[in-house]
Amino acid sequence: MNYYISDLHLFHEAAIRFDDRPFRDLEEMHTEIVKRWNEKVNNGDTVYILGDVSMRGKNEDLIALVAILKGKKVLIRGNHDDVSDLRYRQLFSEVCDYKEIRDSIAGKSYELVLCHYPIFSWKHMSRGTILLYGHTHNSPEDEYFQKCLAGMKAVSYTHLTLPTILLV
């Protein structure tokens, strides 16, 4: 199964306030993110993280936290992602800025474009290719895009799957 999520903002205390997250502190936020992630994702699954995994965490703490998240993790880099530490980078099967993939449900295949940022126009958009992105944190501009926002707050701090994307 493929899962999609964005804007975890681990170790970013201000994200609790500016994103109006329902957590008292970082410890509660991290505990809940890990719990919801590992309840849903299995080790054989792939999770596409559409950017902003963390912002101010010490690398040791960040590495330890990301390492316990189940699944094969693909990072579509966002504006807060620093992957210069090889130990951290190795937690991801791939790190890129933009990715085109196919996902399927009930034998039907769909094209998806994955990027941290919303894009005004993308490959095969007129043929129904789905754009998944993060970054905007439910801003009013989201209404202008034929899209699916995968930001943590927008998806109730859990992951999207292709069936839920198709319902949007």
Model regions: which residues?
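Histidine-centered catalytic micro-motifs
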Residues: L8, L114, T129-P140
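Active-site-proximal beta-strand elements of phosphoester/diester hydrolases
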Residues: N2-H9, E111-Y117, A154-S156
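Flexible, gly/pro- and Lys/Arg-enriched active-site loops
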Residues: Y98-E100, S139-Y157
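Short, polar loop motifs at secondary-structure junctions
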Residues: N79-V83, Y117-F120, T136-S139
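Conserved small/polar residues in nucleotide/adenosyl-binding loops
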Residues: T158-T164
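Core catalytic region of metal-dependent phosphoesterases/phosphodiesterases
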Residues: N2-D103
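Structural motif
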Residues: N2, T46, L112, I130-L132
